[in-house]
Amino acid sequence: GLKFKIYEKNNSPGGTWYANKYPGSRVDIANHFYSYSFEENHLWSEHFSQQPELLDYFNKCFVKYDIEKHTRFETEVIKLNFDEYDQSWSVESIQEAQTISEKVNIVISCVGQLNQPKFPKISGIESFQGNMFHSSGWPKEDVISGKKVAVVGSGASAFQIVPSIANRCKELTIFQRSPPWMFPNPKYHEKVDAGKKWLLSNLPYYSRWYRFLLFYPGSDQLLDSLFIDPEWIKRDDSINQENDAMRELFTQAMLAQISDPSLIKKVIPEY
């Protein structure tokens, strides 16, 4: 096989599931699809597992396939230069405060899109005296119980954090720039029952078809709703008939969870 090296800035494998340990952290794609096709796990405890179980799964894969011998932990790549003459890459990294330069033939970037937390530029933020942290840097100690807490943003992480901490806070306020759509998913907090686990483990090809069933509705099945119909009359908030039906489905699912009319206007997107 090919010789390869993995440069990992953290001191352990797991990637996003190593870094994101905030309350309520869990996957938002069904486990039986959000996993390696060559390393199926038929014993997930939940359809959308929480961070500890996901980290355990990826760590076991890391050990089983003997990836550690190819990995340099606590090593951050700071510069890449391509040499046109010999068609190779110069990789500059930092490990234990030392700069290391190496030549390689191929570079594959797997840094992800969300590995560098970005704080909003808020006037006066430097004078704030309370605890302030990004969701990916959630402290180990409890710093929110009985406190007034502000959550900036209402995206995927906020969907998970807010319900998990609301009852512990003295007061919880969400600051939102624009509302996002929330996909209705009745199985989001459900356990995988024993019957499903048995079928996945024992019925030939069932796990493969089940994986496809989880994949298709969130991909190719949605294509018709993504094309702009030039003759569609409701162009202010939808782009075709299928898209409008999906918007209505999402809207009704959100309305079913909200009873405050003033809040409804704040959480239903206008796009």
Language-model features and meaning:
Residues 2-125, 141, 154, 159, ...:
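N-terminal FAD-binding dinucleotide-binding subdomain shared by FAD-dependent oxidases/monooxygenases
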Residues 103-105, 130, 146:
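Active-site acidic short loop of glycosyltransferases
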Residues 126-134:
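Extended hydrophobic/aromatic segments used for targeting, binding, or gating
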Residues 133-146:
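A short, basic/flexible loop-to-alpha-helix module at the beginning of a structural domain
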Residues 146-147, 170:
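Short coil/turn connectors at secondary-structure junctions
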Residues 147-155:
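Beta1/beta-strand and adjacent pyrophosphate-binding region of the FAD-binding site
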